[in-house]
Curated annotation (Swiss-Prot):
Record key words, sorted: ATP-binding, Cell inner membrane, Cell membrane, Membrane, Nucleotide-binding, Repeat, Sugar transport, Translocase, Transport
Mode of membrane association: Peripheral membrane protein
Name of the protein described by the UniProt record: Galactose/methyl galactoside import ATP-binding protein MglA
SUPFAM superfamilies, sorted: P-loop containing nucleoside triphosphate hydrolases (SSF52540)
A GO term from the CC aspect: plasma membrane
InterPro entries attached to this UniProt entry: AAA+_ATPase (IPR003593), ABC_carbohydrate_import_ATPase (IPR050107), ABC_transporter-like_ATP-bd (IPR003439), ABC_transporter-like_CS (IPR017871), P-loop_NTPase (IPR027417)
Source superkingdom: Bacteria
Pfam families named among the record's database cross-references: ABC_tran
Gene coding for it: mglA
The keyword Transport is annotated on this UniProt entry: yes
CDD domains referenced in this protein's UniProt entry, alphabetically: ABC_Carb_Monos_I, ABC_Carb_Monos_II
Quaternary structure note: The complex is composed of one ATP-binding protein (MglA), two transmembrane proteins (MglC) and a solute-binding protein (MglB).
Length: 506
């Protein structure tokens, strides 16, 4: 698929010029610019906190801009709500999908604008109109199916179809592939090409550089709220884009290997989860100071391994040994007390308490250690440990009382890792630790993982990003349909070998 195919009729659809927005103590946008053309995919890039979300919220009327001009189809606009923007032809497919799960697909597509036959909803027309849109976009979903029964990728297709139904001129996609398999990503890209062919302008927000270079035509880079540059994808390199994003040249994508695996610390033998389908007969060893990656396609049950070890998924059979001693880990609390820690995949839903402070989020897994014999909390020790998390994890924040939800994804993840380190684990399990994190913060997370391995922690890291696994691990365990398809040495393997193993039991 060529992303850079030239279109002779690239009409300018949207121009945002010198848009600024300030909040108390923070200038979130400082004369930011964005120009989107028809028949094109335009990447909006920048580290977390660069101003991407604020710029789009100014477009949708969620924030009132302080200054600047927005032109849509050549006319000045000042939308007061996202509904007004949508009705005028600007749609957004959010990372957190906005669907009513207990209603069916066509209800969601036409919510608030049902076709009527007299005073009654015309269900036949609604079905036929939905089917026509799905046929045009090659979406194979029954319009009468309940949304709750669909996969994340199918829900995403409905959001795109909804934008299509409004005859949107501009479709904004926020991290659209974060939960998709490789096959689903390819399908999404085909739909994006169809939208391009219809004359749409797509604004594509993603931290995945390979996707940007595959599907996009132009890239706008923001940094610290400022417009840095807009460049064509053709003729640009990943290194140039990263340098503009972070304000410095990132000579290496991954830090140098400084860890040295030693003796075996963890033995997992014949591990099978109780509720199937799940993991079956899992066997592997982990050495002190080793980073063991876990690879596999979506649905391979990679997460089930760490959940079963950690006690949040019930074990049917098998043993987990730490230093040769059997660990039952019947609950997460028992696992924590035995020296295990788990950084979960869904940071926002299961990793952080978004509306509470950095202090609370840093200490919650170890709260018992801050109580004296009368059950009172030691404020001094709590403040000291929170400051340790902030300093040692290099968390960028004005205060330990700052709400964690206001931090960038990278800083949130650092707090979560720091929280678990306060429990002094010997085994640290990380499930998709860099998902939704910008390229500069990713490098910091990699450095942190490497340093922990150097301090003799045993690290298990699940990742869907193949370059990440190949760049940071010592060995890779490949899962296929709940079983171990193979364990390979990272230095001697290839992406092709890993993908072949991942398909072994399909």
């Amino acid at each position: 698929m060529t992303a850079q195919s030239a279109q002779s009729d690239n009409q300018v659809l949207l121009t945002m010029t010198n848009v600024s927005k300030s909040f108390p103590g923070v200038k979130a946008l400082d004369k930011a610019n964005l120009t989107v053309k028809s028949h094109s995919v335009h990447a909006l890039m920048g580290e977390n906190g660069a101003g991407k979300s604020t710029l789009l919220k100014c477009l949708f009327g969620i924030y009132a801009k302080d200054e600047g001009e927005i032109l849509f189809l050549g006319k000045p606009v000042n939308f007061k709500t996202s509904k007004e923007a949508l009705e005028n032809g600007i749609s957004m497919v959010h990372q957190e999908l906005n669907l009513v799960r207990q209603r069916n697909v066509m209800d969601n597509l036409w919510l608030g604008r049902y076709p009527l036959k007299g005073v009654f909803v015309d269900h036949t027309k609604m079905y036929n109109d939905t089917k026509a849109i799905f046929d045009e976009l090659d979406i194979d979903i029954d319009p009468r199916e309940k949304v709750a029964n669909l996969s994340v990728s199918q829900m995403q297709m409905i959001e795109i179809a909804k934008a299509f139904s409004y005859n949107a001129k501009i479709v904004i996609m926020d991290e659209p592939t974060s939960s998709l398999s490789e096959k689903e990503v390819e399908h999404l890209f085909k739909i994006i090409e169809k939208l391009k062919d219809r004359g749409c302008g797509i604004v594509y927000i993603s931290h995945k550089m390979d996707e940007i270079f595959k599907i996009c035509d132009e890239i706008t880079i923001l940094r610290d709220g400022k417009w840095i540059n807009t460049v064509p994808v053709k003729g640009s390199t990943m290194e140039q884009i990263v340098a503009m994003m972070v304000g410095r040249e990132l000579t290496q994508r991954f830090p140098p290997k400084i860890n040295e695996p030693k003796e075996v610390i963890l033995e997992v033998e014949h591990l099978t989860a109780l509720n199937q389908p799940s993991i079956q007969d899992i066997n592997f060893e982990l050495r002190k100071g080793e980073i063991l990656g876990i690879a596999g396609l979506v649905g391979a049950k990679r997460t089930d391994i760490v959940e079963t070890i950690f006690g949040v998924r019930e074990r049917k059979s098998g043993t987990v040994k730490l230093h040769g001693k059997i660990m039952k880990n019947r609950t997460a609390l028992e696992a924590i007390n035995n020296g295990f820690a788990l950084v979960t995949e869904e940071r926002r839903s299961t990793g952080i308490y978004a509306n509470l402070s950095i202090e609370f989020n840093s200490l919650i897994s170890n709260m018992k250690s801050y109580m004296n014999k009368w059950g009172l909390l030691s404020d001094k020790k709590m403040k000291s440990d929170t400051q340790w998390v902030i300093d040692s994890m290099n968390v960028k924040t004005p205060s330990h009382k700052t709400t964690i939800g206001s931090l960038s994804g990278g800083n949130q993840q650092k707090v979560v890792i720091g929280r678990w380190l306060l429990t002094q684990p010997e085994i640290l399990m990380l499930d998709e630790p860099t998902r939704g994190i910008d390229v500069g913060a990713k490098y910091e997370i990699y450095q942190l993982i490497m340093q922990l391995a150097q301090k003799d922690k045993g690290i298990i890291m699940i990742s869907s990003e193949m370059p990440e696994l190949l760049g940071i691990t010592d060995r890779i365990l490949v899962m296929s349909n709940g079983k171990v398809a193979g364990i390979v040495e990272t230095a001697k393997t290839s992406q092709e070998e890993i993908l072949q193993l991942a398909a072994k039991y399909l």
